[in-house]
Amino acid sequence: MKIELAESYGFCFGVKRAIKIAEDNKNSSTYGPLIHNSKEIERLEKDFKVGLTDDHKSFASGDKAVIRTHGIPKNELAELKANNVDVVDATCPYVTKPQQICQEMSEQGYEIIIFGDDAHPEIKGVKSYATYGARVVTMPSELEDLKLKDRIALVAQTTRKVEDYLEIANYLIPRYKEVRVFNTICNATFENQEAVRKISKKADIMIIIGGKNSSNTKQLFSISEDNCTDSYHIEDENDLDFSWFKEKKFCGISAGASTPDWIIQNVVNAIQNSI
């Protein structure tokens, strides 16, 4: 069986940057998981004494708080600073972009529409920057019964599928006087999605590696499954079932933006050793 990695996969710029920030700030705590990969979180705690705190109110004056790549709500960031917490911001620059857009466009009187998952930490943060509120949707049908202003600003969660975002934009544009569409899907997300789309069309089994809570990994899996019915989303080599590979001839592999190289290599090695 041939094993091939997608042309683009794994750690993105924002995650690499955040990991470096965390490693440079030993004996600190991240507010929320720095990235959606439990194994990498465990490594940071073991090797660099970087802990994890889920409640921003638990940080005391003088404590060091590393902000997760997904960002946090504006009011919580303000509280941390007001309480003299040493804030180290590891928010991905691609995430701060929609935050800034939401704030600026909301203050200019635009209705803010966010394409994404309302429960995702990135969207909780982005939404908080819309001074006069924002609406979060995942599909065009959710817009049908909404009474919206004539001036709309549209942003997307950085890890969503481009084609799904276009469906939202294409619904709004003919119906409203002014629709400002901002491309806030990050380059790495787009490149990884295109790469998995390409390789999944020629593979008879696909392995997508990443955290179960990772939005961008879920999107990669969705694209892969569209083209290759035998697609599997795993977190590491321990999730592999080697019966999957029986009589397969081409195994394609991709990984989410928060999946470190060492986990990817462990998966590749495990598959190679099984055939």
Swiss-Prot record:
Residues annotated as binding [4Fe-4S] cluster: C12, C92, C186
InterPro entries assigned: LytB/IspH (IPR003451)
Listed name of the protein: 4-hydroxy-3-methylbut-2-enyl diphosphate reductase
Keyword Cytoplasm belongs to the record: no
Pfam family, one: LYTB
Binding site for dimethylallyl diphosphate: H36, H70, H120, S214, S215, N216, S258
Swiss-Prot/TrEMBL keywords: 4Fe-4S, Iron, Iron-sulfur, Isoprene biosynthesis, Metal-binding, Oxidoreductase
EC number from the UniProt entry: 1.17.7.4
UniProt GO BP: dimethylallyl diphosphate biosynthetic process; isopentenyl diphosphate biosynthetic process, methylerythritol 4-phosphate pathway; terpenoid biosynthetic process
Enzymatic class: oxidoreductase
Required co-factors: [4Fe-4S] cluster
Domain of life, per lineage: Bacteria
Binding site for (2E)-4-hydroxy-3-methylbut-2-enyl diphosphate: H36, H70, H120, T158, S214, S215, N216, S258
Role summary: Catalyzes the conversion of 1-hydroxy-2-methyl-2-(E)-butenyl 4-diphosphate (HMBPP) into a mixture of isopentenyl diphosphate (IPP) and dimethylallyl diphosphate (DMAPP). Acts in the terminal step of the DOXP/MEP pathway for isoprenoid precursor biosynthesis.
Entry-linked NCBIfam families: ispH_lytB, PRK01045.1-1
A single GO molecular function term of this UniProt record: 4 iron, 4 sulfur cluster binding
Catalytic activity: isopentenyl diphosphate + 2 oxidized [2Fe-2S]-[ferredoxin] + H2O = (2E)-4-hydroxy-3-methylbut-2-enyl diphosphate + 2 reduced [2Fe-2S]-[ferredoxin] + 2 H(+); dimethylallyl diphosphate + 2 oxidized [2Fe-2S]-[ferredoxin] + H2O = (2E)-4-hydroxy-3-methylbut-2-enyl diphosphate + 2 reduced [2Fe-2S]-[ferredoxin] + 2 H(+)
Binding site residues for isopentenyl diphosphate: H36, H70, H120, S214, S215, N216, S258
Active site: E122
Family: Belongs to the IspH family.
Pathway: Isoprenoid biosynthesis; dimethylallyl diphosphate biosynthesis; dimethylallyl diphosphate from (2E)-4-hydroxy-3-methylbutenyl diphosphate: step 1/1; Isoprenoid biosynthesis; isopentenyl diphosphate biosynthesis via DXP pathway; isopentenyl diphosphate from 1-deoxy-D-xylulose 5-phosphate: step 6/6
Top-level taxonomy: Bacteria, Pseudomonadati, Campylobacterota, Epsilonproteobacteria, Campylobacterales
Co-factor binding details: Binds 1 [4Fe-4S] cluster per subunit.
